[in-house]
């Protein structure tokens, strides 16, 4: 009854109007699972390969018909007959079938679609919510949201260098209240920007994308919005930044070209800059503060700020246990961003989260800039008790879908639901 009898993929669209892969899995007993694969704008060079067709006559070369074909003609025959609850076995079979270190043959978008759809079908088969199926009865922690309310960098068409400026409503007693706080600050920010005569259009992840004079000014207007909403910055709400510095790192000069600031900085100068910002603003999290290959710079940043600021490796670690193990060994950063499509299977995703926790690193489950209505990452965050989630702003249905799923989960958990807020940053000295 739990045997997989059919796997089917199709080409659908993501939140940017670009093609992506959707996969459906069916079992002998009638269980069903469906999953859609996200896509990133700023991608690390060590990420698993997202297979695109390259045919300029279709979707500007971004079609995924080859990935769809790989599911339907190569992966499906391999996993039909598997028990749907054998997640690790199915993921391992697909990894071996691909045979490359970066899933470049079949495509991480093909493999991940199947991996997630299998999990959904298995949860349907056993009659459990996905978070409970994946995490067991210990799955009860709702994540602290990192809400991206100002977009810059490659996520927006403006002159702000840093890619994301986030609010973290750590002072809320429940996840439900954290969402309310975030929404109120978001709407207050819209009013602040409007009063300043600034653009209130939103970027890929639902945050505003105004032309501001500097990265510092972005932090200043967020503080103003927090206060306008009736909250205290540094108490109720903290700040976070995804710098995505690889996007403006100049490999030829070895410097960081911040066009919005009108400056080029060395690694040491960037660390000085972050230290200065952290003194002036209640910043609790910095992601990809230096280039993914600037390990010496990351080491310096960790030495200077690692005890009081969460330093998240995204492009640095790419949800890869080998990269993370190297970072842990060298004492670089203290947190990892978890993106399922960076590594390509749920099994490997869970292994990365487990490795991080064993080493005392935090794990932040994350969306991508090209998202869909699929809310699997919400269930993953609760299943693993990750403690933090980064899934965009308080606008755009592709972002809100994850928050709404978490609200449902909190409601379902009832009295056993846990929202740790500031405690989810367990490796920082408060």
Swiss-Prot record:
Pathway: Carbohydrate degradation; glycolysis; pyruvate from D-glyceraldehyde 3-phosphate: step 4/5. InterPro entries: Enolase, Enolase-like_C_sf, Enolase-like_N, Enolase_C, Enolase_CS, Enolase_N. Mg(2+) binds at residues 242, 287, 314. GO terms for biological process: glycolytic process. The active site is at 205 (proton donor), 339 (proton acceptor). Keywords: Cytoplasm, Glycolysis, Lyase, Magnesium, Metal-binding, Secreted. Its cofactor is Mg(2+). One of its GO terms (molecular function) is magnesium ion binding. Its main location: cytoplasm. Binds a second Mg(2+) ion via substrate during catalysis. Its EC number is 4.2.1.11. The keyword Ribosomal protein does not apply. It catalyses: (2R)-2-phosphoglycerate = phosphoenolpyruvate + H2O. It is found in: Cytoplasm; Secreted; Cell surface. One of its GO terms (cellular component) is cell surface. (2R)-2-phosphoglycerate binds at residues 163, 339, 368-369, 390. It is an enzyme of class 4 (lyase). PANTHER family: ENOLASE (PTHR11902:SF1). Belongs to the enolase family. Catalyzes the reversible conversion of 2-phosphoglycerate (2-PG) into phosphoenolpyruvate (PEP). It is essential for the degradation of carbohydrates via glycolysis. NCBIfam families: eno. This is Enolase. It comes from Bacillus cytotoxicus (strain DSM 22905 / CIP 110041 / 391-98 / NVH 391-98).
């Amino acid at each position: 009854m739990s045997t997989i009898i059919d796997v089917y993929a199709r080409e659908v669209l993501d939140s940017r109007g670009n093609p992506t892969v959707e996969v459906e899995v069916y079992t002998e007993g009638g269980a069903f699972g469906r999953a859609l694969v996200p896509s990133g704008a700023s991608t690390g060079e060590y990420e698993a390969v997202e297979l695109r067709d390259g045919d300029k006559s279709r979707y500007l070369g971004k079609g995924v018909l080859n990935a769809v074909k790989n599911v339907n003609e190569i992966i499906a025959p391999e996993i039909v007959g598997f028990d749907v609850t054998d997640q690790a076995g199915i993921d391992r079979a697909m990894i071996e079938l691909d045979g490359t270190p970066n899933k470049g043959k079949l495509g991480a978008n093909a493999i991940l679609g199947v991996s997630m759809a299998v999990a959904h079908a298995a949860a349907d088969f056993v009659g459990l919510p996905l978070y409970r199926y994946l995490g067991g009865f210990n799955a009860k922690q709702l994540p602290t949201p990192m809400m991206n309310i100002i977009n810059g960098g490659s996520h927006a068409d403006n002159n702000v260098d840093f890619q994301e400026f986030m609010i973290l409503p750590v002072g809320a007693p429940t996840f439900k209240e954290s969402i309310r706080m975030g929404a109120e600050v978001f709407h207050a920010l819209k009013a602040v920007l409007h009063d300043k005569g600034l653009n209130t259009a939103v970027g890929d992840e639902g945050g505003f994308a105004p032309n501001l004079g500097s990265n510092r000014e972005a932090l200043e207007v967020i503080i103003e919005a927090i206060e306008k909403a009736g909250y205290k910055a540094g108490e109720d709400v903290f700040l976070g930044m995804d710098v995505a510095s690889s996007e403006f790192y100049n490999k030829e000069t070895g410097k960081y070209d911040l066009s919005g600031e009108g400056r080029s900085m060395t690694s040491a100068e960037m660390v000085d800059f972050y230290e200065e910002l952290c003194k002036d603003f209640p910043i609790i999290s910095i992601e990809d503060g230096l280039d993914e290959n600037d390990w010496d710079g990351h080491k310096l940043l960790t030495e200077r700020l690692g005890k009081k600021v969460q330093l998240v490796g995204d492009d640095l670690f790419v949800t890869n246990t080998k990269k993370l193990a190297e970072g842990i060994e060298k004492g670089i950063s203290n947190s990892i961003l978890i993106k399922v499509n960076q590594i390509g299977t749920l099994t490997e995703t869970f292994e990365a989260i487990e490795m991080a926790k064993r080493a005392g690193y935090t794990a932040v489950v994350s969306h991508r800039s090209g998202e869909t209505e699929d809310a699997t990452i919400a269930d993953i965050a609760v299943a693993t008790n990750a403690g933090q989630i980064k899934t965009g702003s308080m606008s755009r249905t592709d972002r809100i879908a994850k928050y709404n799923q978490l609200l449902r989960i909190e409601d379902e958990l009832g009295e056993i639901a846990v929202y740790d807020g500031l405690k989810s940053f367990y490796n920082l000295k408060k």
